[in-house]
Curated annotation (Swiss-Prot):
This is DNA-directed RNA polymerase subunit beta'. Binds 1 Mg(2+) ion per subunit. Binds 2 Zn(2+) ions per subunit. Mg(2+) binds at residues 684, 686, 688. The gene is rpoC. Keywords: DNA-directed RNA polymerase, Magnesium, Metal-binding, Nucleotidyltransferase, Transcription, Transferase, Zinc. The RNAP catalytic core consists of 2 alpha, 1 beta, 1 beta' and 1 omega subunit. When a sigma factor is associated with the core the holoenzyme is formed, which can initiate transcription. Gene3D superfamilies: 1.10.132.30, 1.10.150.390, 1.10.1790.20, 1.10.40.90, 2.40.40.20, 2.40.50.100, RNA polymerase II, clamp domain, RNA polymerase Rpb1, domain 3. DNA-dependent RNA polymerase catalyzes the transcription of DNA into RNA using the four ribonucleoside triphosphates as substrates. It comes from Petrotoga mobilis (strain DSM 10674 / SJ95).
Length: 1643
């Protein structure tokens, strides 16, 4: 019974960042060098392998690998033989290793994120970046050249006949003299040299101009005719010198080689001798490796116009390298030539000055070089001046692979880059594409600086190896092992890495090494994110291996499967059965199950009693369960006494799907459930299973008992109506008990004299109290009832006092009531003030009774009443013997007559159609109308037939509401009616048969369409609804009640909800459960409305209960439109609109003109001038809501609506009414209520804006997770609706969830593209003046609607040709009102009318979907979701914040930041004075105008700020500088000094505020746009979110619910709120409670 202080949250925040190679090494316990896992002979982990005990810890608890040290006493010892540290085997779950890679590799998340992080930071295209990292090549088409002999080429190392490609040649050509000739590539060679004549062979050799060998085969015949055959080097000559050959003899195997290159001259030669035999290519297509410049001398960069990070072909890079060598050799010559020359001008440095005319010696030259002089001007011997280059180009480095990228990243100075980007941004238009690109890069640079991450960490040569127990090898049958995919992926990385290391040691050719580096990069990619680039790595069954990313993301990832959905101990599962004898807060728990669940508790009690030693406790444990010790049952009874258990039924759609019960031990194997808690669980007893959980800690038990117990969850949090409602048998029983025969009950009178009792027309019995009546009934039932045999027949003599017999009854107030015995019995259990002895207790009346009991007597009395009703219901349902047979189905005699009449009507319509009086569409509509009317009449006649038979079982079921409805009765005994085809169109031939008479074949076939569609819908839409619920929960999960009152004076105006001329919600329902945002004023007296019945004034802050809501909704008054009166100056009302009836003059000066509004300023001026009274006209109806029927007048023969129902009357409307002679109007007060939409709490909502907690009718408590309740309230019926489709059997009805659910999703997801044509809405308040169609166009005629607004201007609206107008000429329309059919895009409403009308539209439309299905959900739940959808703004210009254009940020946050910026800006002048004389704590960089010509100006840390320095910084538009407030100098070991101390940032240039636009977000997007990265990553796009969060070094402050569940601590909602964290709880057993009470009473 120890006190438990419960909800201390241990983790305040979680930061994510990039792991540097150094940090991985520090965390690692050793390097994994081998790919092996376990030794196949010994089964032990291999040393240095993936399961090595030395690295990851021992396999056996407190035992080293070789077994030298065993036991906990050696803990911490490192075995000198095997090197394993003696510790718990749990270490294998937390110790990590590492793999040292032979070459750096890129992390795939940073390369392939969208947009790519590496690409942005380096400003290199993603494609080029990938090509470099994966050693790719580029396909180029270019000309080729061959080198010619000559000293120039030889000096460059080029031999004659070497190939140069165009880009390479162009580089050489620009800087060097290189002799080349254009070349062609031999694509194909046809044939071989064959002798054309007989003759003698002569072979000659010569060199071509490219110094390649050319053989001439010459054949000369006897007549001196000769033929020449040129053959290129490398060809095999098949004849010899002097050989005689015949015609047709082959002379060589070929004359040219394919893929060879020839100069134009060589090609012409061969073309001459072998015409048509050679095919060549001049533009050559080839793949060539690409490289990136990693370092370059600034002067050389300028000379060749390249910079670090530029992408080149490998050939180009080599050419530049050669060029640099040649240029450097020229510089060497110039250095030698400058010796002994004289300087033309002086050169000065702080350290030394070189005078004009100084002779340049080797020593002077060296000094100048050291000072960084690159060029100098000196005099030649002839007196001319010449520029000499004296400093050679130092470096030109390039490379490929991640290694090259790492070099680039290492070179980035983030501070300098930031200064340069900011400087560049200043010169650009913020909206330009280039500006956005720079902004994105700048944001990334700032993120790196802020987080402390280094860009080079994106490339690593150390990768961590996760602990082996997180990637285990599991032995399966047959001695084989099942391995985790990660082991295979690690194995591949290690194998490839080891192979690369060997190749590097062997100094293998570059091409082999490069290939090996590429496949190592791919192996690491697959380990991190398999399948993201190229083909995924697969196992032998071609199944892609699950990489580290796959372990995180998706439904089966770490977040959703293991962190948000854990398995729970102390739980069980069993089938449920009904427990009619249970109380509402009890459940039946099978004994065996209870013993298993409470085993530790039972064991603890038994051990305490029997003093068993701890060693034998384990044996004892088995004995308890296996042998079922008798003592165990006794202890179990004690243990479970008052110990609540939680029952849960999947799917857990809303919070009442988990409730607490007090268990009762029962025999059998099924959990017994109270029948009245089935509705919230949506459970039935056809094989459903439920899970049971045991709350262990005292606090968990306290929560279960006081918050989750089923008796406290009777009222629905979705709508405030009872959830645990009696149903089926219980209603039938209660109805049977309280029913009567209507005619008899009506006709029998209550006697006024004793003599009248029992006489004709009077009741037979009268009772003085309910107990007397019950006794009499029970006694007569026994005494009077008898069964005896008479004339061979069984005769049952009935009681003289049946249950439904009308009797008289004297009530406590002395009045005599007419009732029945059944009603008296029923009312015994009802609270006295709610007893009604005249009503039949059907479903509706029972619901009302339960609700009234809850309102007046509280939840406990309601729970007791429910139990009583349950007992009565089952008892009397059993006694009633309710059954149905085919004979109980009664068919109306008028049925056939009505059907035949309708058939005649249809024939008449058909003949009119055939005669051409009707179109096909009109004929169809008329026929449908006839059959709809016929079905309604048949239904009415059938109901009339049944009403005559009160005790007909079918009618009893329907009338009581126990089961079935009039529509099903219509199908059984009337006619099935019209059906819909699969597309939803109504089939015009109805089913005239009913189920009693049976359907014909055609009718049966017709009826199958709907049923089939219903079944298909059920299957398809259940998942859709589930996913919708998930998204809703995700978007709203972090909304909890965080404070009592946010203090806002804003609110929304209460109104009835209408959509398309159909009322969706009454005003009273809209008001119920809300808090007033303003006082509600009486339209007549202008005073706060007072309700005498409730003794309540409706002032700001009052919470509206149901009766209050009904009172205010019905509070209407008829008041004059305007009235004239004289008012004293001091009595002038502030809230009214007043106009002066005359000019008010003082000394000739007009203070107030006639007809002008009287303002407060005018009143003050009049008062100062001594005016006492004013004659005014008061427009009394202004700001009140019109609540009469639409007010229409005739103008020029046309009907025009002046005032619409629910329109808020303004001044212009009042004047129009006055103009048309309307004196009075019926209005209701303007009621403004607090709403989640207008709440100004920074996090979550405040209690006042949320209002009443609908499950207990009190103001909501702080900590309530209202977001999740809202999401569940909306999502749960979504699933229900999809499942209910099939109950109608596919009958043609106007609404069906098929339209409902996709429409709800369409609205919540705020689709940009909607199905069907787009509808139009009015953007202003006005009157429709014209509706017309445009001239015909290709697709049809566009609809045009012209509206005159309240200022008299005409506005034209054009709508899609497929739409129809829903308004008529003369109608009044309000802003946001629909004008045409078709779907209105919510985004357009936001754009044109703003956030308020958008929220109103979404609320009406979403509410309509649910209302059509008869689902009641309170508006506040929808408002919470809508709040999340409209809570964000899109940044247009981030100003001087870190926000990027396109970023989505909460509206409140942006407002707050802008306010802070404006406040900071006001201190700039002061700040500028304060910083002068202080020292910089952080260096300030002023970027050079031209990076290549000038150096950046850098004021280092410790620089003292002078006026001059400050002005330079201000001119550069640097916003902030950081200076030391206090500091001291510290000297390092190297002798350098630097400052340390406290620093402060000062704003010295005004910051720009954020410019933004309000945005409507779909719920999926709104879920992702959260400040906390943990919650967002667990929802969708895990990789993207984690990547960005790591770069930014984001901190999650764990404000939401999901984040806290993930880190395993109480959620900041409910009892997890800090408010309740320090409460102490203790569990007091019932007998101790009694003792405590006794002591108290004695005391």
């Amino acid at each position: 019974m120890a006190n438990v202080s419960s909800f201390q949250r241990k983790i305040a925040k979680i930061k994510i960042g990039i792991a540097s190679p150094q940090s991985i090494l520090e965390a690692s316990n050793g390097e994994v060098k081998k790919p092996e896992t376990l030794n196949h002979r010994t089964g032990k982990p291999e040393k240095d392998g993936l399961f090595c005990e030395k690295i990851f810890g021992p396999v056996k608890d407190y035992e080293c690998a070789c077994g030298k040290y065993k036991g906990k006493k050696y803990e911490g010892t490192v075995c000198e033989r095997c090197g394993v540290k003696v510790e718990s085997k749990e270490a294998r779950r937390r110790k990590i290793g590492h793999i040292e890679l032979a070459t750096p590799i890129s992390h795939i998340w940073y390369l392939k994120s969208s947009p790519s992080i590496l690409s942005i930071i380096l400003n290199i295209g993603v494609k080029d970046l990938e090509n470099i990292i994966y050693y790719g090549s580029k396909r180029v088409i270019e000309r080729a050249y061959l080198t010619l002999p000559g000293p120039e080429n030889e000096n460059l190392g080029y031999l004659p006949g070497e190939i140069l490609y165009q880009r390479e040649y162009e580089i050489y050509d620009e800087y060097l003299d290189l002799r080349v000739e254009p070349a062609v590539k031999i694509v194909s060679v046809k044939g071989m040299p064959v002798a054309d004549i007989d003759g003698k062979v002569e072979i000659k050799s010569e060199l071509t101009h490219t110094e390649r060998e050319l053989n001439w085969i010459i054949i000369r015949d006897d007549t001196g005719v000769e033929r020449k055959y040129p053959v290129f080097e490398g060809s095999s000559i098949m004849v010899e010198n002097g050989q005689e050959v015949e015609k047709g003899t082959p002379l060589a195997d070929r004359f040219l080689f394919e893929e060879d290159y020839l100069t134009q001259k060589e090609y012409s030669l061969f073309l001459e001798y072998y015409p048509g035999s050679i095919e060549v290519e001049r533009d050559i297509e080839r793949d060539t490796p690409i490289v990136v410049i990693t370092d370059i001398d600034k002067r050389f960069a300028k000379r060749i116009d390249k910079k670090i990070g530029d992408i080149l072909l490998e050939d180009e890079a080599r050419a530049y390298e050669e060029v640099m060598k040649v240029l450097n050799s020229k510089i060497k010559e110039e250095r030698e030539n400058v010796i002994d020359k004289e300087l033309v001008s002086e050169i000065e440095f702080p350290e030394k000055k070189f005078e004009k005319g100084t002779k340049i010696t080797q020593e002077v030259l060296n000094e100048l070089q050291e000072f960084g002089v690159k060029d100098l001007v000196a005099k030649e011997e002839d007196g001319t001046e010449k520029i000499f280059q004296i400093n050679r180009y130092e470096k030109f480095e390039y490379g490929y692979g991640a290694e090259a990228i790492q070099k680039l990243l290492t070179k980035i100075d983030l501070e300098v880059l930031k200064a340069r980007l900011e400087s560049e941004l200043e010169k650009l238009d913020r909206k330009s594409q280039k500006s956005v690109k720079i902004l994105r890069r700048l944001k990334l640079v700032k993120d790196f600086i802020k987080s402390g991450n280094q860009p080079e960490w994106l490339i690593t040569n150390i990768i961590p190896v996760i602990p082996p127990d997180l990637r285990p090898l599991i032995q399966i049958d047959g001695g084989r092992f099942a391995a985790t995919d990660l082991n295979d992926l690690y194995r591949k990385v290690i194998n490839r890495n080891n192979r690369l290391r060997k190749l590097l040691e062997m100094e293998a050719p570059e091409i082999i090494v490069r290939n090996e580096k590429r496949i190592l990069q791919q192996a690491v990619d697959s380990l991190f994110y398999n399948g993201r680039v190229g083909k995924p790595m697969t196992d032998r069954n071609r199944r892609p291996l699950r990489s580290l990313t796959d372990l995180l993301k998706g439904k089966k990832g770490r977040f959703r499967r293991n962190l948000l959905g854990k398995r729970v101990d102390y739980s069980g599962r069993a089938v449920i059965a009904v427990g009619p004898d249970l109380k509402i807060h009890e459940c039946g728990l099978p004994k065996k199950m209870a013993l298993e669940l409470f085993k530790p508790f039972v064991l603890a009690e038994l051990l305490r009693d029997s003093n068993v030693a701890s060693k034998s406790a384990r044996k004892f444990k088995k004995t308890i369960i296996e042998k079922e010790m008798p003592e165990a049952w006794e202890v179990l009874e004690e243990v479970i006494k008052g110990h609540p258990v939680l029952l849960n039924r999947a799917p857990t759609l809303h919070r009442v799907s988990i409730q607490a019960f007090i268990p009762k031990l029962i025999e059998g194997n099924a959990i017994r459930l109270h029948p009245l808690v089935c509705p919230p669980f949506n459970a039935d007893f056809d094989g459903d299973q439920m899970a049971i959980h045991i709350p262990l800690s005292n606090i968990a038990q306290a929560e279960s008992k006081f918050l989750m117990l089923s008796r406290y969850n009777i009222i629905s949090p979705a709508n405030g109506k009872p959830l645990s409602m009696p149903g089926k048998d219980i209603i039938a029983g209660a109805y049977y008990l309280t029913m009567h025969e209507d005619e008899k009950f009506k006709n029998l009178k209550v006697p006024t004299k004793v003599s009248e009792l029992g006489k004709n027309g009077y009741v037979k019995h009268i009772f003085s109290e309910d107990l007397e009546a019950t006794y009499a009934y029970e006694y007569l039932k026994i005494v009077d009832s008898d069964i005896y045999l008479q004339d061979g027949k069984l005769i049952w003599k009935k009681s003289d006092l049946p249950l439904h017999e009308p009797v008289a009854f004297r009530y406590k107030d002395g009045s005599i009531l007419k009732t029945t015995i059944g009603k008296i019995i029923f009312n015994e259990e009802v609270p006295e003030d709610l007893r009604d002895y005249t009503q039949k207790m059907d479903k509706k009346n029972l619901k009302e009774l339960i609700f009234n009991t809850f309102e007046k007597h509280g939840i406990d009395r309601t729970a007791d009443l429910l139990d009583s009703i349950k007992d009565f219901g089952f008892h009397y349902a059993t006694l009633s013997g309710l059954t149905i047979s085919i004979r109980d189905v009664l068919v109306s005699p008028k049925r056939e007559e009505l059907i035949e009449e309708s058939k005649g009507e249809v024939l008449r319509i058909e003949s009119l159609y055939e005669e051409g009086y009707l179109t096909d569409n009109e004929r169809y509509k008329e026929i449908i109308k006839i059959w709809e009317s016929a079905t309604a009449k048949v239904t009415e006649e059938t109901a009339k037939t049944y009403r005559k038979y009160t005790f007909n079982p079918i009618w009893m079921m329907i009338e009581s509401g126990a089961r079935g409805n009039i529509d099903q009765l219509k199908q059984l005994a009337g006619m099935r009616g019209l059906m819909a085809d699969p597309s939803g169109k109504i089939i015009e031939v109805p089913i005239t048969s009913n189920f009693k008479n049976g359907l014909s074949e055609l009718e049966f076939f017709t009826s199958t369409h709907g049923s089939r569609k219903g079944s298909a819908d059920t299957a398809l839409r259940t998942s859709t609804a589930g996913y919708l619920t998930r998204r809703l929960v995700d978007v709203a999960q972090s909304i909890t009640i965080t404070e009592e009152d946010c203090g806002t004076d804003k609110g929304i105006e209460a109104r009835e909800l209408w959509a398309d001329d159909s009322k969706i919600e009454n005003l009273s329902d809209f008001l119920f459960g809300r808090v007033l945002a303003k006082d509600v004023l009486d339209p007549e007296t202008k005073e706060v409305i007072f309700n005498p019945q409730a003794d309540k004034k409706y002032e700001r802050g009052i919470i509206l209960k149901e009766k209050d809501a009904q009172f205010l909704a019905n509070y209407v008054k008829e008041i004059p439109v305007s009235k004239e009166k004289t008012i004293k100056i001091e009595d002038m009302p502030k809230d009214s609109y007043l106009e002066s009836l005359e000019d008010v003059q003082v000394e000739g000066k007009v203070l107030i003109k006639k007809g002008e509004e009287i303002t407060e300023e005018a009143i003050e001026e009049a008062f100062l001038h001594g005016i006492q009274k004013l004659d005014v006209k008061e427009y009394t109806a202004v700001d009140y809501v019109y609540s009469g029927e639409d007010l229409k007048v005739e103008i020029d023969g046309k009907t025009v609506t002046l005032l619409k129902y629910q329109e808020r009357i303004d001044l212009k409307v009042s004047k129009v009414l006055e103009k048309h002679g309307i004196k009075t109007v019926t209005v209701r007060p303007s009621i403004f209520i607090r709403s989640p939409l207008t709440c100004e709490s920074e996090n979550g909502l405040c209690a006042k804006c949320y209002g009443m907690d609908l499950s207990n009718y009190k103001l909501v408590n702080r900590g309530e997770a209202v977001g999740i309740i809202a999401a569940q309230s909306i999502g749960e019926p979504g699933t229900q609706l999809t499942m209910r489709t099939f109950h109608t059997g596919g009958i043609a009805t106007t609404s069906d969830i098929t339209q409902g659910l996709p429409r709800a999703e369409e609205l919540f997801e705020a689709r940009k593209k909607t199905k069907g044509p787009e509808g139009e809405f009015s953007k202003t308040k006005g009157i429709v003046r014209a509706i017309e169609r445009d001239t015909e166009n290709k697709r049809g005629r566009r609809l045009k609607i012209i509206i005159e607004n309240s200022d008299g201007e005409l506005e034209s609206y054009e709508a899609d040709y497929r739409t129809k107008a829903v308004v008529e000429e003369g109608d009044k329309v309000l802003a946001g009102q629909r004008l045409t059919t078709g779907n209105i895009k919510p985004r357009n409403i936001l754009k044109e009318l703003g956030v308020g009308p958008l929220a109103n539209y979404l609320l009406s439309e979403i509410k309509k979907i649910y209302a059509e299905q008869g689902v009641d959900i309170h508006d506040k739940h929808f408002e919470i979701i809508i709040r999340q959808m409209i809570n964000k703004v899109e940044i247009i210009d981030g100003g001087d914040t870190d926000f990027m254009p396109g970023d989505l940020v909460s509206y409140g946050k942006v407002q707050k930041i802008n306010e802070e910026i404006l406040e900071e800006n006001s201190y700039i002048t002061e700040n500028r004075e304060l910083v002068v004389g202080k020292k910089l704590a952080k260096r300030v960089i002023i970027p050079a105008e031209d990076e290549e010509e000038e150096e950046d100006k850098i004021f280092e840390q410790g620089t003292e700020i002078t006026e001059e320095i400050l002005n330079q910084i201000i001119e550069t538009n640097i916003k902030e500088i950081e200076v030391y407030e206090e500091y001291k100098e510290i000297t390092t070991e190297e002798g350098k000094t630097h400052l340390v101390g406290t620093s402060k940032k000062y704003l010295i240039n005004p910051k720009d505020t954020i410019k933004y636009e309000r945005r409507l977000l779909r719920i999926t997007k709104a879920s992702l746009e959260r400040e906390g990265w943990l919650s967002a990553a667990s929802f969708q796009q895990t990789v993207q979110i984690l990547t960005e969060a790591a770069i930014e070094g984001k901190v999650d402050r764990l404000k939401g619910l999901k984040e806290n569940v993930i880190v395993g601590q109480p959620i900041p909602a409910g009892t997890g709120l800090k408010l309740y964290a320090d409460q102490n709880y203790e569990v007091v057993q019932p007998e101790k409670e009694a003792e405590a009470a006794q002591e108290k009473s004695v005391g």
